[in-house]
């Protein structure tokens, strides 16, 4: 069952990535990136990286939502162009979806895809977990290192996101 959840999240991830460059309006490009980021975080959570998935979701998607929210509020169009309003953009989007669908069908029919890795069927996409031999897990040690030794990194990252939002607001407003 979990293999199918990851498979569906992978399809949503690719659809979001196809929808991002074929954007007719900047609002939909940001939406494609946010959908892809959420699906990627879901895949990381499914493979056992609960803290990593949560941190990526909060920091990356939180920062993107703030930036895209402010920029679309400052430079919004009254009637934004959608994917179906331009036949070339719609055709490119549908062509990308069709190519992804054909690649998935080829892999599901026990075909072999050999680019960098060799996939022969859907079972090869599953990551097999190994049991930890230590007392502490890797994620707990990473959290401890982030908040003890890397506290200034967290502060600088938060401040950089704030300054980025202020700069983008000033640039889009023309001030």
Swiss-Prot record:
Membrane topology classification: Multi-pass membrane protein
Quaternary structure note: Core subunit of respiratory chain NADH dehydrogenase (Complex I) which is composed of 45 different subunits.
Record's catalysed reaction(s): a ubiquinone + NADH + 5 H(+)(in) = a ubiquinol + NAD(+) + 4 H(+)(out)
Top-level taxon of the source organism: Eukaryota
Transmembrane segments: 1-21, 25-45, 47-67, 88-108, 115-137, 149-169
InterPro entries xrefs: ComplexI_Subunit6, NADH_UbQ/plastoQ_OxRdtase_su6, Nuo/plastoQ_OxRdtase_6_NuoJ
Job of this protein: Core subunit of the mitochondrial membrane respiratory chain NADH dehydrogenase (Complex I) which catalyzes electron transfer from NADH through the respiratory chain, using ubiquinone as an electron acceptor. Essential for the catalytic activity and assembly of complex I.
Protein name: NADH-ubiquinone oxidoreductase chain 6
Gene Ontology MF terms in the entry: NADH dehydrogenase (ubiquinone) activity
EC number: 7.1.1.2
UniProt-annotated location(s): Mitochondrion inner membrane
Any one of the GO CC terms: mitochondrial inner membrane
Keyword Oxidoreductase (UniProt): no
Keywords on record: Electron transport, Membrane, Mitochondrion, Mitochondrion inner membrane, NAD, Respiratory chain, Translocase, Transmembrane, Transmembrane helix, Transport, Ubiquinone
Pfam families on file: Oxidored_q3
PANTHER family, per database record: NADH UBIQUINONE OXIDOREDUCTASE SUBUNIT ND6 (PTHR11435), NADH-UBIQUINONE OXIDOREDUCTASE CHAIN 6 (PTHR11435:SF1)
